Swiss-Prot record:
This is Vesicle transport v-SNARE 12. Residues 68-95 form a coiled coil. The lineage of its organism: Eukaryota, Viridiplantae, Streptophyta, Embryophyta, Tracheophyta. Changing E129K: In zip1; dominant suppressor of the zip1 mutation (plants lacking VTI11) by changing both the specificity of SNARE complex formation and its intracellular localization. The modification N-acetylserine is found at S2. Residues 2-199 are cytoplasmic. Disulfide bonds: none annotated. The gene is VTI12. Gene3D superfamilies: 1.20.5.110, t-snare proteins. It comes from Arabidopsis thaliana (Mouse-ear cress). Belongs to the VTI1 family. GO terms for cellular component: endosome; Golgi apparatus; late endosome; plasma membrane; SNARE complex; trans-Golgi network. Pfam families: V-SNARE, V-SNARE_C. Together with either SYP41 or SYP61, required for membrane fusion; the fusion of phospholipid vesicles containing SYP41 or SYP61 and VTI12 is triggered by YKT61 and YKT62. Functions as a v-SNARE responsible for the docking or fusion of transport vesicles within the trans-Golgi network (TGN) and mediates liposome fusion. Necessary to deliver proteins to the protein storage vacuole (PSV). May be also involved in retrograde traffic to the cis-Golgi. SUPFAM superfamilies: SNARE fusion complex, t-snare proteins. The chain crosses the membrane at residues 200-220.
C-alpha cells in the first residue's frame, strides 16, 4: 500500500477522533461564545477531513489494481464516518433548537453520538483490521510472485546459457562435418589419382613386355 495513503489515513483517524470528542463537548454547552468557538473548530476540522478524504481518493486511484481495491474499500468506511460526523455537527450547530427542547436534544444527541460513534468506530476498526490483513496477504502474495519471477528469470537465464552452449557445440560439430567432407574429397581425389597412376604403370609394363617379346622374336627369327 502507498505510504502517502497511509499518512493521510493516520491524519484522518486522529482528526475523526478529535472531532467526535468536540461534537460531544459542544452538545452539552449552552449557546454562547464558547459553543460558537467550539462549533467553528468542528467546522474547520470537518473541512480538513474533507480535504484528506479527497487526497486519499486521488492517491488510491493512482495505485496498482490490487492496492487500489484495498484503499478504496477503506476510503468508503472513512466517507461513511465523515458523513456521520457531519450529521452530528449539523445537529449540534442547529440554530433552530428551541430552549424548551434543548435538554431533550442534548440527552438524545449525547446518547446517539455515543451509540452511533461507538458502533461506527467499532465497525470501522474491524473493517480497517480486515483490510490490513488483506493488505498483508496481498503484500505476501506479491513477495511470492516476485520470488517466483526471480526464479523464472534465473531459469530463463540458465536455459539461455545452455542454448548458447548447445549452439556453440553445434557450430563446432558443423565445423567438424565440414573438415570431414573436405577430407573425404581429398581422399577421393587421391584414390582417383592412385587408380589413374596404377593404370598408367600397368600400361607401361604391358608395353615393355610386348616390346621385349617383339625383340626376342626378331632375334630368334634371324
Amino acid at each position: 500500500m502507498s505510504d502517502v495513503f497511509e499518512g493521510y489515513e493516520r491524519q484522518y483517524c486522529e482528526l475523526s477522533t478529535n472531532l467526535s470528542r468536540k461534537c460531544h463537548s459542544a452538545s452539552v454547552l449552552s449557546n454562547g461564545e464558547e459553543k460558537k468557538g467550539k462549533i467553528a473548530e468542528i467546522k474547520s476540522g470537518i473541512d480538513e477531513a474533507d480535504v484528506l478524504i479527497r487526497k486519499m481518493d486521488l492517491e488510491a486511484r493512482s495505485l496498482q489494481p490490487s492496492a487500489k481495491a484495498v484503499c478504496l474499500s477503506k476510503l468508503r468506511e472513512y466517507k461513511s464516518d465523515l458523513n456521520q460526523l457531519k450529521k452530528e455537527f449539523k445537529r449540534v450547530s442547529s440554530a433552530d433548537a428551541k430552549p424548551s427542547s434543548r435538554e431533550e436534544l442534548m440527552e438524545s444527541g449525547m446518547a446517539d453520538l455515543h451509540a452511533v460513534s461507538a458502533d461506527q468506530r467499532g465497525r470501522l476498526a474491524m473493517s480497517v483490521e480486515r483490510l490490513d490483513q488483506s493488505s498483508d496477504r496481498i503484500r505476501e502474495s506479491r513477495r511470492l510472485m516476485l520470488e517466483t519471477e526471480e526464479v523464472g528469470i534465473s531459469i530463463v537465464q540458465d536455459l539461455s546459457q545452455q542454448r548458447q552452449t548447445l549452439l556453440h557445440a553445434h557450430n563446432k560439430l558443423h565445423g567438424v562435418d565440414d573438415a570431414i567432407d573436405k577430407s573425404k574429397k581429398v581422399l577421393t581425389a587421391m584414390s582417383r589419382r592412385m587408380t589413374r597412376n596404377k593404370w598408367i604403370i600397368t600400361s607401361v609394363i604391358v608395353a615393355l613386355v610386348l616390346a621385349i617379346i617383339l625383340i626376342i622374336s626378331y632375334k630368334l627369327s634371324h
